Amino acid sequence: MKGTKHILAILACLLLCTASQAVQRRKEPGARIPESVLPTDRDDPALWTLQPVKSTRAASPGQYATTTDIPRTGTVECLLILADFNDCSFRIKDDHKLVQYYERVFNEHGYIDPNIYERNGVKYPGVIGSVNDYFRAQSYGQYDPVFNIIGPIHLTQGYSSYGKNDSYQMDIRGVKAMVREICDSLSARGMNLAGYASKGAVHQFSVIYAGKGENSNSSDPNLIWPQASTLSYTYYDKDNNRIPLSIEFSCSCELFWDTDTIPDGIGTFCHEFSHTLGLPDFYNTISEQSSESNAAMGFWSLMDYGSYENGGFSPVGYTAFEKYSLGWMDIEEIGYDGLYYLNDISRKPDPESGIHSAYRLNTGNDNQFIILENHLKTGWYKYHAAEGLMVTAVNYSKDSWQGNILNTNSSDKRYHILPADNNSNRYTNAGDLFPYYATDSITTLGTPKLKAGQSFPSYSIYNIRRQDSLVTFLAGKDLPSNVENPKQQGTAVTVYDISGKPVLKTTTTDPEHISLPGHGIYIVRYGNIVRKITQ
C-alpha cells in the first residue's frame, strides 16, 4: 500500500519523540480537524502531525448487567461445592487431595498447570492462571473472588437422574434438584447458608460435578449440561426459623470433553460464573449452526465461544463491553475529530492521564453504540487469532438481555463484532480485526457498515494503524470519499470433510491460513489448488 512504510516510520518517530509530553497533551481539549487538513490521500503523512485528542466525557456503565445487587468489587467469598454421584466419582479419590487440587486451580495466585494435555492428536497447554487470577485480571484488580471449597458432597442418585433431558431437551429441573439436595446436605452439616446471603440471595453458589458435561458429549443426553440459574430454597437456622433464600448458582463438569482422566480447563466455569455476575450469552442460544456460520462474537468473547480458547484451558479475556457492563471500566466517548490511540485491553485504563483501552462511538440512540478496543496476543488474550482494533456494535434491549436471546436473529444481532473482512464465520476470524491488509477504515458507507442496530454514529474511523502495543486511528465527521473500505474480493474456498461432504464455504484473502471447523482431516480447495490438512 502506497506510503505505508513512510507513515509507520513517521508514527514511530512521533510516538517516541513525544512520549514524555504525551500525558500532559492528552489533558488538553481536543481540536476539530479543519477541512483544509482532511487528506485526499489516506496515507498523507500530514495526518500524523495531529495531536491525540481527549474526548468529551466518560460514559458510565449502564443497565447492561442482567443481575443487580451482586458484589463485583473487593474480596468476595464464594461457595464452591464439589459433588459426585452414586455411579460417578471424581478422578482424584482422596478427598483431601481433591480439595487441595481445586484450591490451587481456583484460588492460588499465579497458578500455572505445566502439563500438556492431548486429545485426538491435538495438544493443549494447561491453564495459565487460576480462576481468581482470571477475574482479578478482567476487573483490573477490583474484584477478588475467594472460593470456599467444600466437599465432596455425595449425591444420592446417579448422574442421569439429574441430567436426563425433558421433551424440550433441557435438564434444568434435574439440575435444580441436584442443587437443592446439595443445599440440604450443607444444612445437615450445620452450614449457615444464610450467612452467605445478601438481601435474601446467595450469590455465586458454584458446583463442580464429577464426570463429563453434555456440552461436549451430546451422544449422552443424560449428562448434565453446564449452566447457571436460580433456585428458591427454604433454609432453617439452628432455632428452626424459616429463612427463604434465592440460590443463584452455576455448575460445570470435572472432565475435559470426552476424556476420563484429563481435568477440564477453567473456561466453562468462568463462562457460567460470569452469568451469576450478570453477563448473558452472546452466541445464538437457539441455533448452533447459525451461531457458527454467522457468529456474533465467536472466539472473541468468553460469553460466546471464547470459553473454549485453547480447549478451555485458557479462556479469552473479557471484551471492553463485558468489563463495562460489570462496572470494571468506563469507556470514553469520542467527541472530536482527531487522532486517537489505544493501549491494549488487558491494561488498566487511566482516564486522568489519558490512557485508554477502549472508546465509544455514540449514535442518536442511547441504546445503540459502537465500541473500539485494542487487542493484543498477551495474557488471557494470547490465543487470539489476530491483533489490532476490534470494532463491536451494541443494540441494547432489556427484554433480550433478561431473556438471554440477544443474538438469535442473525440479521439483527444485539452485540456482535464488525469483522474487517466482513466474514462472520466463527472459524475464519483471523481477518476480524483492523487493519486487515488494505482494510484500515470502517465507515457508515463501507463494508461492513459502521452501524449499531439501525443507528449510525456521527464519526467514521479511518487510517487505523498498529504500532508496537498501540492502535491509532483517525475519527472524523467529514470522511473523504476515497477513504471508504473496498469490498473484499478474496478467493473462494471450499472445505470438505474426509467423506467429501462440504463443511465450509467462504471467501478470504488468505486461503493458505483458513481456520478449520474443528479437529479432523479436511480437503481444502481454492482455484486449482487442492490441499489435505489434518487438524
Named regions from a protein language model:
Residues 1-8:
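Bacterial N-terminal signal peptides that target proteins for export
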Residues 12-21:
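Hydrophobic h-region of N-terminal signal peptides that target proteins for export
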Residues 23-39, 91-125, 133-140, 219-259, ...:
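Non-catalytic C-terminal accessory/binding modules of secreted extracellular proteins
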Residues 23-105:
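Primarily auto-inhibitory N-terminal propeptides
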Residues 61-70, 120-245:
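Active-site-proximal segments of metallohydrolase catalytic domains
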Residues 157-173, 258-263, 276, 280-359:
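A domain-level signal for the mature, folded cores of soluble proteins
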Residues 267-282, 372:
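Active-site recognition of the HExxH zinc-binding catalytic motif
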Residues 481-535:
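C-terminal outer-membrane/trafficking sorting elements
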